[in-house]
């Protein structure tokens, strides 16, 4: 029988791991992560998700150029102006910012990327499109954590969507929704930093405290 306590423990300790060793990751582990992704719910079970596994350094370097540009022009300045989110101290937030900067400079060095995509044909992405791909992304993040691998969900490349999707070689009608850099973590796994439920959960009416 499955140990559900282990599942909840993994959820509580699957934080973004942005500092990754460049050492190769066995294909067997990547396959397990992909299987976990393909077990996720999706709209109408249409399974329009597509997963592009990137190991080619030249492709990663081509994307990293735009990834860094997005940091320099948008993400970096936003961090400098932002206060720490709920459940996170200033010291923790500064460490997070440093890790984001590290990933910016070393994004292409992660041994494996999984690019989560949807095959959408001529239809434009809609507000609900993500419902058919982001559950798979979360499954893959949890699977990576269970296997002792570090990963993070990043969508920053979408600030230069056309340029990065061209570098990735995506065909017309296929859109990327996230990139998961995966590798063995340099640091230790630990609990996620989150605020209390009382600040984010309501009952029956917006603003009415949830008392359970």
Name these PLM-found stretches:
Residues 46-55, 146:
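Short loop-to-beta-strand entry elements in the cores of soluble alpha/beta enzymes
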Residues 6-23:
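Generic N-terminal amphipathic, Lys/Arg-enriched alpha-helix
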Residues 10, 113-115, 179-181:
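Conserved hydrophobic/aromatic beta-strand scaffold that supports enzyme active sites
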Residues 3, 17, 175-212:
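C-terminal helix-cap and adjacent tail motif
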Residues 39-46:
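Glycine-rich phosphate/pyrophosphate-binding beta-alpha loops
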């Amino acid at each position: 029988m499955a140990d559900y306590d282990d599942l909840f423990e993994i959820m509580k300790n699957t934080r973004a791991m942005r500092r990754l060793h460049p050492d190769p990751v066995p294909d067997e582990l990547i396959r397990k992560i992909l299987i976990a992704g393909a077990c996720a719910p999706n709209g109408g079970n249409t399974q329009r998700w597509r997963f592009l596994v990137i190991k080619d350094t030249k492709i990663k370097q081509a994307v990293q150029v735009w990834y860094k540009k997005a940091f320099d022009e948008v993400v970096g300045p936003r961090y400098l102006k932002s206060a720490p989110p709920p459940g996170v101290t200033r010291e923790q937030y500064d460490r997070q910012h440093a890790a984001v900067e590290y990933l910016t400079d070393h994004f292409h060095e992660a041994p494996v990327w999984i690019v989560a995509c949807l095959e959408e044909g001529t239809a434009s992405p809609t507000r609900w499109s993500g419902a058919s791909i982001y559950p798979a992304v979360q499954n893959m993040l949890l699977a990576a954590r269970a296997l002792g691998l570090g990963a993070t969900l990043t969508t920053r490349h979408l600030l230069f969507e056309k340029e990065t999707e061209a570098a990735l070689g995506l065909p017309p009608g296929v859109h990327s929704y996230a990139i998961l850099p995966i590798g063995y973590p340099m640091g230790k796994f630990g609990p996620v930093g989150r605020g209390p439920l009382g600040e984010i959960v309501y009952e029956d009416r917006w603003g009415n405290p949830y008392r359970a």
